[in-house]
Amino acid sequence: MPSTDLLTLKAFEPYLEILEVYSTKAKNYVNGHCTKYEPWQLIAWSVVWTLLIVWGYEFVFQPESLWSRFKKKCFKLTRKMPIIGRKIQDKLNKTKDDISKNMSFLKVDKEYVKALPSQGLSSSAVLEKLKEYSSMDAFWQEGRASGTVYSGEEKLTELLVKAYGDFAWSNPLHPDIFPGLRKIEAEIVRIACSLFNGGPDSCGCVTSGGTESILMACKAYRDLAFEKGIKTSEIVAPQSAHAAFNKAASYFGMKIVRVPLTKMMEVDVRAMRRAISRNTAMLVCSTPQFPHGVIDPVPEVAKLAVKYKIPLHVDACLGGFLTVFMEKAGYPLEHPFDFRVKGVTSISADTHKYGYAPKGSSLVLYSDKKYRNYQFFVDTDWQGGIYASPTIAGSRPGGISAACWAALMHFGENGYVEATKQIIKTARFLKSELENIKGIFVFGNPQLSVIALGSRDFDIYRLSNLMTAKGWNLNQLQFPPSIHFCITLLHARKRVAIQFLKDIRESVTQIMKNPKAKTTGMGAIYGMAQTTVDRNMVAELSSVFLDSLYSTDTVTQGSQMNGSPKPH
């Protein structure tokens, strides 16, 4: 009796014969068509078409999509058209002037120092001059700024200043000269690994801030992906993930794939699964994300990371040093978020936020040293010797690390738990009260310290303008239009939260008398920027702000900034 395999093969024989006939015809057609060409011509055409195909592939498949590049080209050509381009530029220049006029930090009534003094000043004279500069600072001591300063307590400040002073000349680049500083940084990393439930192989690095921590994780995963044969690595991140991931993509030649959010402002896990490709180098979650203070579903995304064998980075820069103390503070989170979750391979956390260290202090942590090794940079052939650097910077200020260590030791576990308790209690109180104010709503279900507000009745930027007029400083957000307030220890004081609610209620009541009125000032500029289709134009407007940071011209002298060739 014939076998099943033999019967199956015989069943396909007619189809194989047909295929052979057509393949023979195709071969004869091609051979006949090529007889009129000489061999060198066939080779030349093959080379030309191969190059064209390779060029076409590289042109289409770039980190920036073809559609995005097409739009940029169209907008660029439009701005070069004689009449339309001139009108666009005039409007752009007017907007730049409006932005400059609304920059409060440029309104300085004292002359800028533009050259070294001929004779050096005494210590007392220098300190007296510095008092003039510190007196320009805004109202942060009163607790009216969103985030920005996370403690500001006088005794803590004295401790941090003393710790910095003792290590002012130290540099982690030279551990042989400053072994005590090396010990300090190693202890900071180990303490953080323990707080985030890292195992014995967990490790990390001290960085200059959250952006550098994120950059380092992205660099590590890019190099890991490259080793696997992925030439253009993709970062799959929620729409709400920090802009530092875009910066990493720009710096390191990666592509960022943004994933939409659910109505609760969490990442859509199913959409994230669809976004994963053979070029995906890393997945991203936030705990919490900056815009709305919402925590992404880390365990669900971690399952994708494990299934597809992709590293998962959890960005805890903003709330990391709250999340690790939430349970002991009496506010347990619904889901784990750290190295306890299988699939989480790295975490970024800022010690200079709720770790209460001075600015310029953050951490990037890894579940295993094998990931951190890809972060390192080593040049074995430099004439100056073998150069090895763990992070972006070479030399770093040891005083910052010493002050960070001092803050950790000063607060201790009990101190951090108590601080977390005060902040979350204040945040939960504000959230419950804000949800009951007619005309505004709270985005998602923020569980930590950030509360984002929106409105279906009026332009929310009007509320930001009115609160600014009352002395508050809120963060303006976009897509969708919203504002947020980040609660710190300064806001946990008795009357700050009450005054904030009072001013919000008064402002909303005033707006609701004429809800359709147009926004003015910076709110209008921000709203306009959000609706502008040409994002390059928005970037150009943003450069006005960046230029202004280094302006040494008084407001009355015009709007020309340092580094600008001429006034616009």
UniProtKB/Swiss-Prot annotation:
**Would you tell me the Gene Ontology cellular component terms?**
endoplasmic reticulum; endoplasmic reticulum membrane
| Residue positions, PTM 3'-nitrotyrosine | 356, 366
Q: Name one GO biological process term.
A: fatty acid metabolic process
Q: What does this protein do?
A: Cleaves phosphorylated sphingoid bases (PSBs), such as sphingosine-1-phosphate, into fatty aldehydes and phosphoethanolamine. Elevates stress-induced ceramide production and apoptosis. Required for global lipid homeostasis in liver and cholesterol homeostasis in fibroblasts. Involved in the regulation of pro-inflammatory response and neutrophil trafficking. Modulates neuronal autophagy via phosphoethanolamine production which regulates accumulation of aggregate-prone proteins such as APP. Seems to play a role in establishing neuronal contact sites and axonal maintenance.
Main location per UniProt?
A: endoplasmic reticulum
Q: What is this protein called?
A: Sphingosine-1-phosphate lyase 1
Name any one GO molecular function. Answer: sphinganine-1-phosphate aldolase activity
Species whose genome carries this gene: Pongo abelii
InterPro entries attached to this UniProt entry? GrpII_AminoAcid_Decarb (IPR050477), PyrdxlP-dep_de-COase (IPR002129), PyrdxlP-dep_Trfase (IPR015424), PyrdxlP-dep_Trfase_major (IPR015421), PyrdxlP-dep_Trfase_small (IPR015422)
Q: Which residues lie on this side of the membrane: Cytoplasmic?
A: 63-568
Q: Which positions carry N6-(pyridoxal phosphate)lysine?
A: 353
Membrane-spanning intervals of the chain:
42-62
* Pathway per the UniProt entry: Lipid metabolism; sphingolipid metabolism
Subunit details: Homodimer.
| Positions bearing Phosphoserine | 564
Tell me the protein family, please: Belongs to the group II decarboxylase family. Sphingosine-1-phosphate lyase subfamily.
Ordered alphabetically, the record's keywords are: Acetylation, Apoptosis, Endoplasmic reticulum, Lipid metabolism, Lyase, Membrane, Nitration, Phosphoprotein, Pyridoxal phosphate, Signal-anchor, Sphingolipid metabolism, Transmembrane, Transmembrane helix
Q: Which residues lie on this side of the membrane: Lumenal?
A: 1-41
Annotated membrane topology is: Single-pass type III membrane protein
Q: Which EC number(s) does UniProt give?
A: 4.1.2.27
Which cofactors are required for activity? pyridoxal 5'-phosphate
State its location(s).
Endoplasmic reticulum membrane
Q: Which residues carry this modification: N6-acetyllysine?
A: 353
Key word Endoplasmic reticulum present: yes
Q: Which domain of life is it from?
A: Eukaryota
Catalysed transformations (reactions): sphinganine 1-phosphate = hexadecanal + phosphoethanolamine; sphing-4-enine 1-phosphate = (2E)-hexadecenal + phosphoethanolamine
Q: Which SUPFAM superfamilies match?
A: PLP-dependent transferases (SSF53383)
